[in-house]
A protein has these predicted regions:
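Residue-level detector of alpha-helical transmembrane segments in integral membrane proteins
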Residues: 35, 42, 46-47, 69, ...
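Fungal secretory targeting signals
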Residues: 56-81
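Intrinsically disordered, low-complexity regions enriched for glutamine and histidine
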Residues: 2, 60, 76, 104-106
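Compositionally biased, intrinsically disordered/low-complexity regions enriched for serine, proline
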Residues: 39, 46, 50-51, 73, ...
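Primary mode marks residue(s) on the alpha4-beta5-alpha5 output face of response regulator receiver
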Residues: 80-105, 109-240, 247-384
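Intrinsically disordered, low-complexity basic segments at termini and long loops, enriched
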Residues: 1-63
Length: 384
């Protein structure tokens, strides 16, 4: 990646949670100073012309676990997008797992294009007319289950750090690549995780699905595979990393996962092993980040009491976190973005963007007609 792009990264880091990042005049040496928040006084890390700035930033990330800009922490990343999508709708519809069913089994939080409905086939991007995402050519839909507090009040979503002004709740979406990739084709869909995951051992196998108990919006704390066991000062951060190797044939599979293969080993943004012969096509690394604002319920969480939060599918451990994806980029726009080394964060030459006040005008109708907010006596779809 060019010095100019790493200079852009430095701009994002300046002043973020006690971090100062500067380039030398020649753009070949990145110096990052960490504040005393690490407990040992200021620390300065320097990348020489012979070392990789991404490697340096990965070190910082593992020391501090405090940046939402994780895209920049992988070495090497040749192109990538990071952008926000405001919330589109919250209702019991799932066109991937339960196509045609209205309602579906549990409530989902959905962002993206307005073609979203109970039945979605073919080229979604060709049917949508607007999107809640900053990338104006992205009419995909992204969704996850939705958590509630223990007495079934829906937990609100709040903005992640370093998103476009006006982003309302929603998700942070990443598309990254470390080598030449093939963009998802029209009609493609997949899921990651499962609401039936019920044990710690099962959850640990989903390496790309993790939580963080936010100390501040930029200080995440350690990753965990289940819900935090104590109140989080700034909310609960959930991340979903999808597999990035495709069989090259099927747009979907009966379990919505077998047509993909996961090469994530440790860090969710790193796909080091090559794709296997059974799934030879490397696709973009897709990631969702969501910040659940659990802070309004912290005073209702007695000291020493179990975690009160429950996913909309009735999961209280957090093990069953999962996410769905329906590809809907217009034409070859995603392929162009992944081909361009200057694509970084939300800036990418010919890829069109929109202001979030325009994105926030995009809506879909309530297709189920049930109450999902306020103090409920039971989870929607789970009434006895």
């Amino acid at each position: 990646m060019s010095p100019q792009l790493w200079g852009l990264l430095a701009k994002y880091l300046i002043g973020e949670d006690g971090v100062n990042a500067t380039w030398d005049a020649g753009g070949t040496r990145l110096e990052v100073t960490l504040s005393t928040s690490l407990g040992s006084g200021p620390i300065t890390l320097v990348s020489s012309p012979f070392s990789s700035p991404p490697s340096l930033l990965a070190l910082i990330y593992h020391r501090m676990k405090s940046f939402s800009v994780a895209l920049a922490l992988i070495a090497p990343v040749h192109a990538g997008l990071r952008f926000g999508c405001s919330s589109l709708t919250i209702q019991r519809i799932d066109p991937v797992v339960e196509p045609g069913h209205n309602p579906s089994a549990h409530v989902h939080h959905i962002v993206g294009g307005n073609a979203f409905n109970a039945t979605m086939t073919g080229d979604v991007g060709a049917r949508a007319t607007c999107t809640t995402c900053e990338m104006a050519e992205d009419f995909s839909n992204y969704w996850t289950a939705h958590p509630t507090n223990g007495s079934y009040h829906r937990v609100p979503v709040k903005n992640n750090a370093a998103l476009a002004a006006g982003t309302t709740g929603g998700m942070t979406i990443y598309y990254t690549q470390q080598q030449y990739i093939t963009a998802f084709p029209p009609g493609f869909r997949m899921t990651v995780g499962s609401p039936t995951t019920s044990t710690l051992d099962q959850a640990r196998k989903h390496i790309g699905l993790r939580y963080n108990c936010l100390q501040t919006l930029l200080n995440r704390g350690p990753e965990m595979v289940d819900f935090p066991t104590k109140p989080c000062p700034a909310g609960i951060f959930a991340v979903h990393h999808f597999p990035a190797c495709w069989d090259g044939k099927n747009l979907d599979s009966p379990d919505h996962q077998s047509h993909m293969y996961n090469t994530i080993q440790y860090d969710g943004f790193t796909n080091a092993p090559p794709c296997p012969a059974s799934h030879p096509v490397r696709m973009p690394q897709l990631t969702y980040e969501t910040v659940w604002d659990t802070t309004k319920f912290n005073s209702m969480w007695p000291s020493g009491a179990p975690n009160p939060f429950v996913w909309s599918f009735q999961g209280s451990s957090g093990y069953g976190t999962h996410a769905d994806y329906m590809f809907g980029w217009k034409g070859d726009s995603l392929q162009r973005a992944m081909n361009k080394s200057e694509c970084f964060y939300d800036g990418c030459g010919s890829i069109k963007k929109q202001t979030m006040n325009i994105a926030n005008q995009c809506t879909v109708k309530d297709m189920v007609g049930e109450q999902t907010d306020g103090w409920l006596t039971a989870l929607p779809g789970m009434q006895m």
